């Protein structure tokens, strides 16, 4: 059995150019530009993030595209920061780049500091400083046993 891990996260989007610009503004590095305008790939701290036309993604997965996506799709992505100031900075940048701030940064019930934003396509991100999950030098959370 291959080692269990997440290697790539693909987000279905209706406006690839707008959403790609949003992620570039947040500091994600776009790669594989030769792939054309059908898909955008970004380095995302040990995993790859891709943006792909939502209708084509549904078709590829043999699913029916939803006519109108709900506000909450049952998944959040997370961006952990080394400090509370980092959380504030990411949320401010997301808001200025066209994201929608869903929850301003604040103390969390679990002892950290966090807030939420949605990208221009409605994908929800939590931005958090979690003192219980220190970050490794490459930005990955260290989970306790």
Enumerate the language-model features and the residues they cover.
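Glyoxalase I/VOC metalloenzyme domain signal
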Residues: 1-7, 12-34, 44-100, 118-145
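Minor-groove-contacting beta-hairpin "wing" of winged helix-turn-helix DNA-binding domains
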Residues: 39-43
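Short, small/polar residue-rich loop motifs at catalytic or cofactor-binding pockets
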Residues: 110-112
């Amino acid at each position: 059995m291959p080692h269990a891990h997440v290697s790539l996260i693909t987000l279905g989007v209706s406006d690839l150019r707008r959403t790609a610009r949003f992620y570039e503004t947040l500091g994600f590095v776009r790669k594989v530009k030769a792939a054309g305008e059908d898909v955008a790939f970004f380095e995302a701290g040990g995993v790859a993030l891709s943006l792909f036309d939502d209708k084509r993604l549904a078709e590829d997965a043999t699913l029916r595209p939803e006519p109108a996506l709900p506000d909450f799709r049952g998944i959040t992505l997370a961006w952990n920061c080394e400090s509370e100031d980092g959380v504030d900075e990411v949320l401010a940048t997301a808001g200025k780049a066209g994201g929608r701030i869903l929850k301003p940064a604040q103390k969390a019930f679990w002892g950290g500091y966090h807030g939420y934003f949605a990208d221009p396509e409605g994908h929800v991100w939590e931005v958090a400083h979690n003192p219980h999950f220190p970050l490794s030098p490459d930005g990955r959370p260290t989970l306790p046993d």
